[in-house]
């Protein structure tokens, strides 16, 4: 019945929002037959719950339920969220839940006796029923999906005109619960229902509900039918609308629900509720509290008050009815819901649609939403009562924040004493009711603002952490149940689908309601709490982990679950979710659980610590918006699950050390990658079983390898952890790098390999452990990983202390091995550079002295750095070749290489240092060189750098100047020689012709005229060309720019070095000439003076024959002709010159012999 009712309720609830019925119809995938079956099951449960309904009816003064009226006072006392104690809810027939519940008690329910109705069945049913029941009286809701309407019919028979019941008109605007009229002690009734549910061992609470009996209605007062934010409103929905419809017989219940639905519209008419409902509807599931923008807190408070009264009066009976219905329906719904459950693909599609349809409520900060079966059903219920729930949830969220924490604590205590370990549900905790309408999870304490939701959730979590008594035992039971449930269709991702759909419904009441109903009907009732639990744990562990954008609401649920899981021992956002966790749901597989875990706590005010999860796992508070935005296109659940399973085995070993920090980085990963990574990481990190002995170890490990975890980004599926240990997956550094560096990296990789081996061991064990409870599955791996990592970390962490620029590694690091190796290299590098290395990095090259002689200090220092790793290097040298070094940026690679180059290679190149240092190699050239060449180039660059550093700035400048001067001199010399010898005929011809023309022009015109003409000729050429190019560009519409731009931008200034060079040379010649002339004119040597006199006498004749320009012309001609002639006839010319020289000497000897003075001087 529950399945049918839930689907129908979901349909009605989805219909109840103002959305057009056709949209809902289209979106509802649920089949009418399935819903009818569920309705029948629900009717059966209602029969069992008749007594509860009677009590509820009695408690429901305004509802006027047709069922046997139980005095409202008799119903659980007004459930005051603020009150510390929760009035015991009359148990009544709750224990006598319809056999359907026991029959189908999902594996998530640990024990029929202890099934804590995460949501009172009546409440769950009521939300679903109210939309339908209320629809006929008020405005008929858009025809729910086939599956939804049948459910509504059985649940909707208006047997008793409830107090102005909210009409399940299918419009959210119509408050499913009327604050003034119907908001009677609904809260107490929910509490009572919870108590009753706790008493009802036969009642099977939905996976999310079992462990949260107290959380069910108390925190879930705003159930799907009720405004998700308003706990009371939810309860009113469940109690006023649905409970009133609940009668001793199924028909009576249905009638009562119908009447309650009628009452609900009236209540919905409440201006406060009406205003808030539309807004709340969006929030009902994922954003119950945060999405209610329009709902004033005052209104929320009013709603809470009214609903509290109604709930107090009706809560017990309704709770009993709802609990029994919910408990039964969760049990029955697994089958019915399975029927209604759309294939995981459909559910994923629906979920995607919901995601797409998600509106403002995208916040989904409410992490309390756990993937309940009810959460799926919540979609159905949500449609009809979403608005009401949202409004009430909003009201209740405010009131609940203040009161619910105490009241829930008391309630949880009372409920726990009543045989339920679950803590009182927190109003902020959305409690999906198993019944179709109740299926959606609503946070009673959600406030209209996200802040209130977050505040409520976290305070409640903190306050009720003790209240939530789901212990590691419960977790284990859930795990066991989950293992069994994994095989069932529910194990498919119904949680994600249902939650997603329901969340989308909350967010977008118009378009999502359709999808949510279909998705809800398709979803298995139970959201494997185990999955949720694991998801919560991994999420808490990876709270900063990726959040699936499409999973916005799912993330909320998952987050809440993860928070509850993580808080599970310590604090829980929502007891109802805790119950969901405690009650393993057969629907979701562990991977799904883990995958949702990835979703971060929605904008959690403070990070929630998850005792069951390693303390390190506690996710730092992360804004939901920032987190959820990243994974926008989640893969289908099946794909995600498959990928997660595969990646789980492979990445568990790999990411375990990384999982702590990787979760945060994975925020952007797609759902699949998130699921896989989170699963891996979550399991690895949160693997520790209830005994937290491993957590401290993990914490130590995390501390020891924080940087590694930060650097490691393997969590994303892109990292392909399986390949991380294979050489193929590791980027190879060009083997041009020095062997020393290779050894260094290899030593690092060796360490990483050790870790990898441990991880691989874990990976081999993990596939077998996948079926094991989440906490237990990976503990062994954690230990092994810790050991491996701890062994490697001492050296790495010490080096890591050195400030490193991680950006350089981000591009190349994809695996632990790579990370370790690259990190090790950089650490060494940083130590060498930053700590003691005086060497500066020039041109992006860490310039190291190639020879130990040049840099004994650096070599010694580097050797010291290497000493710790020498053993590792020695070990690795044998097998290092198999592992390619991590390819790092050029600068980084060189930095890593240089230190070892000094140690290992400096001797090799020390002999060549003088020649090597002279040559400079560019980084690009070095990277292109072969290993030896690269080593040599590195050494050269090192030597060059060191030399430059050793030199004083002035020395360096002088050397640079001399170098440039030499280069320019060489260029000039080479060019002049080439010109004189006509090496380049064109060039020489141009120079020779221009020079000769200039000299000839000077013979005709004055130098001034020649200069002017030359300038005009030049300008005429340049201007003409400039205009020509401009015209061409205009015609071609090209934008080439100035034709002489290159020349204009080129440096034409004469360098100071060049000037100094030539000036120094000229100055020397001038000085020597002056000295010589002084000697000649002062007759230092009479003979030399006479020779000079004869020479001058000869020039007098030459001057009479030749003009100065003529001489210049002759000299120019000779300059360009004699060298060529001499080069071609050098032998002959040398022979004749020798003969001439000999004859001249002979003549001089004769003359000197005749002149005694000359002879003596010659001697």
From Swiss-Prot:
For bias type Acidic residues, the affected ranges are 31-55
Give residue spans on the Lumenal membrane side.
1011-1104
Gene Ontology MF terms: protein-containing complex binding; ubiquitin protein ligase binding
Annotated GO biological process: axonal fasciculation; blastocyst formation; brain development; cardiac epithelial to mesenchymal transition; cell adhesion involved in sprouting angiogenesis; cell migration involved in vasculogenesis; cellular response to hypoxia; central nervous system vasculogenesis
Q: Which residues carry this modification: N6-acetyllysine?
A: 1075
Residues with the Phosphothreonine modification = 347, 429, 832
Phosphoserine modifications at: 7, 16, 107, 149, 169, 171, 329, 333, 343, 425, 488, 689, 726, 766, 830, 855, 922, 962
- Parts of the chain on the Cytoplasmic side: 1-989, 1126-1163
Where expressed (tissues)?
A: Isoforms A, B and C are present in optic nerve, spinal cord and cerebral cortex. Isoforms A and B are present in dorsal root ganglion, sciatic nerve and PC12 cells after longer exposure. Isoforms B and C are detected in kidney, cartilage, skin, lung and spleen. Isoform C is expressed at high level in skeletal muscle. In adult animals isoform A is expressed mainly in the nervous system.
Asked if Transmembrane is a keyword of the record, the answer is yes
- Spans through the membrane: 990-1010, 1105-1125
All copies of domain Reticulon, residue ranges: 976-1163
Q: Where is the sequence biased in composition, kind Pro residues?
A: 87-101, 138-147
- A Pfam family in this protein? Reticulon
Comp. bias (Low complexity): 7-16, 62-79
The entry's free-text remark on domains says: Three regions, residues 59-172, 544-725 and the loop 66 amino acids, between the two transmembrane domains, known as Nogo-66 loop, appear to be responsible for the inhibitory effect on neurite outgrowth and the spreading of neurons. This Nogo-66 loop also mediates the binding of RTN4 to its receptor.
Please explain the role this protein plays, according to its UniProt record: Required to induce the formation and stabilization of endoplasmic reticulum (ER) tubules. They regulate membrane morphogenesis in the ER by promoting tubular ER production. They influence nuclear envelope expansion, nuclear pore complex formation and proper localization of inner nuclear membrane proteins. However each isoform have specific functions mainly depending on their tissue expression specificities.
> Subunit details for this protein?
Binds to RTN4R. Interacts with ATL1. Interacts with TMEM170A. Interacts with RTN4IP1.
This one is known as Reticulon-4
Q: Which organism is it from?
A: Rattus norvegicus
């Amino acid at each position: 019945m529950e399945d049918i009712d839930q689907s129908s309720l979901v349909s009605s609830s989805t219909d109840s929002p103002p959305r057009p019925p056709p949209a809902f119809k289209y979106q509802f995938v649920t089949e009418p037959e399935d819903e009818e079956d569920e309705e029948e099951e629900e009717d059966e449960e209602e029969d069992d719950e008749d007594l509860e309904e009677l009590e509820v009816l009695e408690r429901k003064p305004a509802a006027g339920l047709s069922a046997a009226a139980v005095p409202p006072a008799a119903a659980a006392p007004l459930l005051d969220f603020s009150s510390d104690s929760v009035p015991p809810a009359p148990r009544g027939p709750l224990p006598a839940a319809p056999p359907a519940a026991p029959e189908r008690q999902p594996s998530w329910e640990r024990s029929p006796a202890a099934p804590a109705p995460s949501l009172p069945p009546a409440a769950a049913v009521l939300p679903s029923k109210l939309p339908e029941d209320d629809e006929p009286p008020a405005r008929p809701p858009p025809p729910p999906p086939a599956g939804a309407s049948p459910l509504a019919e059985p649940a909707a028979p208006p047997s008793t005109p409830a107090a102005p019941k909210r009409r399940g008109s299918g419009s959210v605007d119509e408050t499913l619960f009327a604050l003034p009229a119907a908001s009677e002690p609904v809260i107490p009734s929910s509490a009572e229902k919870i108590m009753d549910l706790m008493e009802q061992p036969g009642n099977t609470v939905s996976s999310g509900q079992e462990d949260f009996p107290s959380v069910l209605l108390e925190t879930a007062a705003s159930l799907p039918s009720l405004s998700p934010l308003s706990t009371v409103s939810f309860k009113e929905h469940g109690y006023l609308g649905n409970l009133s419809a609940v009668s001793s017989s199924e028909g009576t219940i249905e009638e009562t629900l119908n009447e309650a639905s009628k009452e609900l519209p009236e209540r919905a008419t409440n201006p406060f509720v009406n205003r808030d409902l539309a807004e709340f509807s969006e929030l009902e599931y994922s954003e119950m509290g945060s999405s209610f923008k329009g709902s004033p807190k005052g209104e929320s408070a009013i709603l809470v008050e009214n609903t509290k009264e109604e709930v107090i009066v009706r809560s017990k009976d309704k709770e009993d009815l709802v609990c029994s219905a919910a408990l039964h329906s969760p049990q029955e719904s697994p089958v019915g819901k399975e029927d209604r459950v759309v294939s995981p693909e459909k559910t994923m599609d629906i979920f995607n649609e919901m995601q797409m349809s998600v509106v403002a409520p995208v916040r989904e900060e409410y992490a309390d939403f756990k993937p309940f079966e009810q959460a799926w059903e919540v979609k159905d219920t949500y449609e009809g009562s979403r608005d009401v729930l949202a409004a009430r949830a909003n009201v209740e969220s405010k009131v609940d924040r203040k009161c619910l924490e105490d009241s829930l604590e008391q309630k949880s205590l009372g409920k726990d004493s009543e045989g339920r370990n679950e803590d009182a549900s927190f109003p902020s905790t959305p409690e999906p009711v198993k019944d179709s309408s109740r299926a959606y999870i609503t946070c009673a304490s959600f406030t209209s603002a996200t802040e209130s939701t977050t505040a409520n959730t976290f305070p409640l979590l903190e306050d009720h952490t003790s209240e939530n008594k789901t212990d590691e035992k419960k977790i284990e039971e859930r795990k066991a149940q989950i293992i069994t449930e994994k095989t069932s269709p529910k194990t498919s991702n119904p949680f994600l689908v249902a939650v997603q759909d329901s969340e989308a419904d909350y967010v977008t009441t118009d378009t999502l309601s359709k999808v949510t109903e279909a998705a809800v009907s398709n979803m298995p009732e139970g959201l494997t709490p185990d999955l949720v639990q694991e998801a919560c744990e991994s999420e808490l562990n990876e709270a900063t982990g990726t959040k699936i954008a499409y999973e916005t609401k799912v993330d909320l649920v998952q987050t809440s679950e993860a928070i509850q899981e993580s808080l599970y021992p310590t604090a829980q956002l929502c007891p109802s979710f805790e119950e969901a966790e405690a009650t393993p749901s057969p629907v979701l597989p562990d991977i799904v659980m883990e995958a949702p875990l990835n979703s971060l706590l929605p904008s959690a005010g403070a990070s929630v610590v998850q005792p069951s999860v390693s303390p390190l796992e506690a996710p730092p508070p992360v804004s939901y918006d920032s987190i959820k935005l990243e994974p926008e296109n989640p893969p289908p659940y099946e794909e995600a699950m498959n990928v997660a399973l595969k990646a789980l085995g492979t990445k568990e070993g790999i990411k375990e050390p990384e999982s702590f920090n990787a979760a945060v980085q994975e925020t952007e990963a797609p759902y699949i990658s998130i699921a896989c990574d989170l699963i891996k990481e979550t399991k690895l990190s949160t693997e520790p079983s209830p005994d937290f002995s491993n957590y401290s170890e993990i914490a130590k490990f995390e501390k020891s390898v924080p940087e590694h975890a930060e650097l490691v980004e393997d969590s994303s599926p892109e990292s392909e952890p399986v390949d991380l240990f294979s050489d193929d997956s590791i980027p190879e550094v060009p083997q041009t790098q020095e062997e020393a560096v290779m050894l260094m990296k290899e030593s690092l990789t060796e360490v990483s390999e050790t870790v990898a081996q441990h991880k691989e061991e874990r990976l081999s064990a993990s596939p077998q452990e996948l079926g094991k409870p989440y906490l237990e599955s990976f503990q062994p791996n954690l230990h092994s990983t810790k050991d491996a990592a701890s062994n490697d970390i001492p050296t790495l962490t010490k080096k890591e202390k050195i400030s490193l620029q991680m950006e350089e590694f981000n591009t190349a690091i994809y695996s632990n091995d790579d990370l370790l190796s690259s990190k090790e290299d950089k650490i060494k590098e940083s130590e060498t550079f930053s700590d003691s290395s005086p060497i500066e990095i020039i041109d992006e090259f860490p310039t190291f002295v190639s020879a130990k002689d040049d840099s004994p200090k650096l070599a010694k220092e580097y050797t010291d750095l290497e000493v710790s790793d020498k053993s590792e290097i020695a070990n690795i040298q044998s097998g290092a070749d198999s592992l390619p070094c991590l390819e790092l940026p050029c600068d980084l690679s060189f930095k890593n290489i240089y230190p070892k180059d000094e140690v290992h290679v400096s001797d090799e190149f020390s002999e060549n240092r003088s020649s090597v240092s002279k040559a400079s190699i560019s980084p690009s050239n070095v990277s292109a060189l072969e290993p030896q060449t690269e080593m040599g180039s590195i050494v050269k660059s090192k030597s060059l750098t060191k030399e430059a550093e050793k030199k004083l700035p002035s020395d360096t400048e002088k050397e640079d100047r001399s170098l440039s001067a030499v280069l320019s001199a060489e260029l000039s010399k080479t060019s002049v020689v080439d010109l004189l010898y006509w090496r380049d005929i064109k060039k020489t011809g141009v120079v020779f012709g221009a020079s000769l023309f200039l000299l000839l022009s000077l013979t005709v015109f004055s130098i001034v005229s020649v200069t002017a003409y030359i300038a005009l000729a030049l300008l005429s050429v340049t201007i003409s060309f400039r205009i020509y190019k401009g015209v061409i560009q205009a015609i071609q519409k090209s934008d080439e720019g100035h034709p002489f731009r290159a020349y204009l931008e080129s440096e034409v200034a004469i360098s100071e070095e060049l000037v100094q060079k030539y000036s120094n040379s000229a100055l020397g010649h001038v000085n020597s000439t002056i000295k010589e002339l002084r000697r000649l004119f002062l007759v230092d040597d009479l003979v030399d003076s006479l020779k000079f006199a004869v020479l001058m006498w000869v020039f007098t004749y030459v001057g009479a024959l030749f003009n100065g320009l003529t001489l210049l012309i002759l000299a120019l001609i000779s300059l360009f002709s004699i060298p060529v002639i001499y080069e071609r006839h050098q032998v002959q010319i040398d022979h004749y010159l020798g003969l001439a020289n000999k004859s001249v000497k002979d003549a001089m000897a004769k003359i000197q012999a005749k002149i005694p003075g000359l002879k003596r001087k010659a001697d």
